[in-house]
Amino acid sequence: MRKLASALLKPGTLGRWFVAGVYHHPLRFPVALCRSVVATKKLTGHIFPLRVRLGIGQTLRVSVGCKSRVTLTGNLLVNSWGGSNIPSSISCADESSLAIAGDFEIGPNVHIEVVRGANLTLGGKRHSSASGITCNSRIMVENSVAIGADCIIAWDVYISDSNWHEITGMTRCAPVSIGDHVWISHGVSVLKGAVIPSGCVVGAKSLVTKSFSTERSLLAGIPAKEIRSGMEWSR
């Protein structure tokens, strides 16, 4: 029994989430549980394992199109930040693909849109204490966006691989790649063709528009440039 209790209450497990919810919010937790079941069903097509877990008062709007592929080997955690309960959303159009490899957390007013035939990969948590998007941010995918493990995305961040409109003489879209253990600060925009290597930090309000190759570097500016190398950071 002791081993079972220890396993159930291990950080990040369904048991710990359930027990904490019932203990701290006995009246409101059933609503969060029902919303989590519905969101899991919409995203994955089944309700067990319960991969989507909503915090108290949080709402996740889910739309999954025909023949789309959603793979959650980790858990999608929807929590509050700064007391906000603005709904977040995930939209996967027909024949699109969304894969979340490890636990990934999103806050309020986070919107993820994957259009027809596009692919989005989120590495989630692997070694760090958490990985995810704080709040008020948007990811829009027309072709391919890959975000590695143990990444932190702050608030007011925009990530997209497309212009979303045709501009004469310019490529409409190009894949975006973000490595492992990357910290994207407040107000950053990551646009088509951007490559951010593992271990990098992107300074606040920066605009990333091209491919970088040096890991563990500080990228900052409009457009972003390599400011410093040999960066070390942690949560």
How should these model regions be labeled?
Residues M1-Y158, G179-H181, S198, T214-E215, ...:
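Domain-scale signature associated with acetyltransferase and cell-envelope carbohydrate enzymes
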Residues M170-G179:
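Glycine-rich NAD(P)-binding loop of Rossmann-like domains
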Residues A154, S185, G203:
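ABC-type ATPase nucleotide-binding domain
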Residues N136, M140-V141, V188-V201, S206-S211:
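Beta-rich strand-turn-strand
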